A protein has these predicted regions:
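Short amphipathic alpha-helical segment within the helicase RecA-like ATPase core
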Residues: 1-222
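A generic structural signal for tightly packed, nonpolar segments enriched in small/aliphatic residues
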Residues: 160-448
Length: 448
């Protein structure tokens, strides 16, 4: 803690009495007058006699939560603060979590309005891995910024530019296949979904790391706006469809963290980026679309387009013989109905890896919930004139049938993860599952 920083005494309620025993009498009187009990989410500013701030008391959960101090960044007066030594934050991991929560609570998306007042700042606590905190925070900010940006400023072109900027920063190789070149290079499904839009469809590819390290492929759905296509959405359903590229945003956020932390992996990032638009060239219901894998898809619903573009991207990912494929996508409302808006669904075909991700998510307070790849539902995605359909009839098990669809295109004998989540929360875009996956990858492969 620096001399200029205002101390924050973060305390669980059962530690408050012991702390007060060593506090000056005027502080004890102030705490009593305000009936401060150190309940989670509460705080008390302790004044100096000269009118400044002597310190802040902040209540902690038991066990300590990442989010315990997150609101303080915007509720405390501007200035620099530091965690004072207390029993609850003596553990470096707990202090690190509190610092990350503080930074995440500082986030504001003000690209289109006057800048918000500068939030209060927290100096890194002693023993904290500041590089890891900063990498995770920047990764999450990146996801939030990308998802919050409206579609008129975040189409396939701009999404590719964001990926290119990340590649340049970390000396990763970058390639993009655009428009009719998708047909020339055998990505017909991506082309079919995106060809109706003015901003041409594309496949974004980024590669980073040592080829001698295990290959990890990240695949993210990049539907930059989803009108539903000819099976058009309602006004309510369409309103927040700028967030339908949340899977791509998550992949770029994870890639940023992986590269910043120098994980010992050979990273492959693939993002099929399209707008699902309406025009005379739009994909029609009951069209049959070919894929890079040679599997034919019957378009049961043009609003189930995300899995169609992911089919080509997953096939491409498998061509690099990865050890792990991780696929992030906002595929179905069914997952939201089943699990709500704060708990992403995890589909995984390997029990060991699924458990590793679930444990990492619990430890990082970034929980996921595993859903079954129930083989009995495969018949629900059988096509009538094509091999499979992108929209199972009947309306049942929508999240599972979407995952089973993607499983057809995942490389064989490779452990494949698929996360179906809702990246947009009421306050805007959010990174869900990112910290869990970064932690699981770091645990599995280590840092250079």
């Amino acid at each position: 803690m620096t001399d200029a920083a205002i101390p924050i005494h973060a305390l669980a309620s059962n530690d408050l009495a012991a702390w007060l025993e060593g506090a000056p009498s005027e502080v004890r009187a102030w705490v009593a007058a305000h009936d401060f009990k150190a309940k989670p989410g509460t705080h008390l500013v302790v004044p100096e006699t000269g009118g400044g701030i002597a310190g802040v008391l902040a209540g902690l959960s038991e066990p300590t939560s990442l989010w315990d101090l997150a609101s303080l960044a915007k509720t405390l007066p501007s200035g620099t603060y530091a965690l004072a030594p207390t029993p609850a934050v003596s553990d470096a991991d707990k202090a690190e979590a509190l610092m990350l929560g503080w930074i995440l609570g500082s986030y504001t998306f003000d690209k289109y309005r006057d800048a918000a007042p500068q939030p209060a700042k927290l100096t890194p606590p002693t023993g904290v891995d500041s590089a890891r905190v900063e990498a995770l925070a920047e990764a999450i900010y990146t996801v939030r910024d990308l998802v919050n940006t409206p579609a008129n400023d975040m189409g396939p072109t701009e999404l590719a530019a964001a990926a290119k900027g990340l590649a340049d920063r970390f000396d990763a190789s970058f390639d993009v296949t655009i428009g009719d070149a998708l047909l020339d290079d055998n990505y017909p499904a991506i082309h079919a979904v995106g060809r109706a839009a003015k901003d041409s469809p594309r496949l974004i590819e980024m590669t980073w790391g040592d080829p001698d390290h295990p290959t990890v492929a990240l695949v993210g759905k990049g539907v930059c706006f989803d009108s539903g296509g000819l099976d058009i959405k309602s006004a309510t359903g369409m309103k927040w469809m700028k967030k339908d590229m949340g899977g791509a945003a998550h992949v770029l956020g994870i890639a940023l963290a992986v590269m910043a932390l120098k994980l010992k992996v050979y990273l492959k990032v693939l993002i099929p980026a399209v707008e699902n638009a309406i025009s005379g060239d739009a994909m029609r219901p009951m069209d049959v679309v070919r894929t890079r894998a040679g599997i034919s898809i019957e378009i049961g619903n043009t609003d189930a387009e995300g899995r169609v573009i992911l089919a080509d991207a997953l096939t491409r990912a498998g061509e690099s013989n990865p050890e792990v494929v991780i696929d992030f996508a906002t595929l179905t409302g069914a997952a939201r109905v089943a699990l709500g808006t704060e708990l992403p669904a995890l589909f995984c075909n390997d029990d060991t890896l699924a458990n590793a991700v679930l444990v990492a998510g619990t430890n990082a307070e970034d929980a996921l919930w595993r859903m079954p790849l129930w083989p009995g539902y495969r018949k629900m995605i059988e096509g009538k004139v094509a091999e499979i359909t992108n929209s199972a009839e009947g309306g049942y098990a929508g999240a599972i049938t979407a995952a089973l669809f993607l499983e057809r295109f995942a490389p064989k004998d490779v452990m494949a993860w698929n996360v179906s989540s809702k990246p947009g929360r009421p306050e805007g875009g959010e990174a869900m599952g990112l910290r869990a996956f970064v932690a699981a990858l770091a645990e599995r492969y280590g840092r250079a």
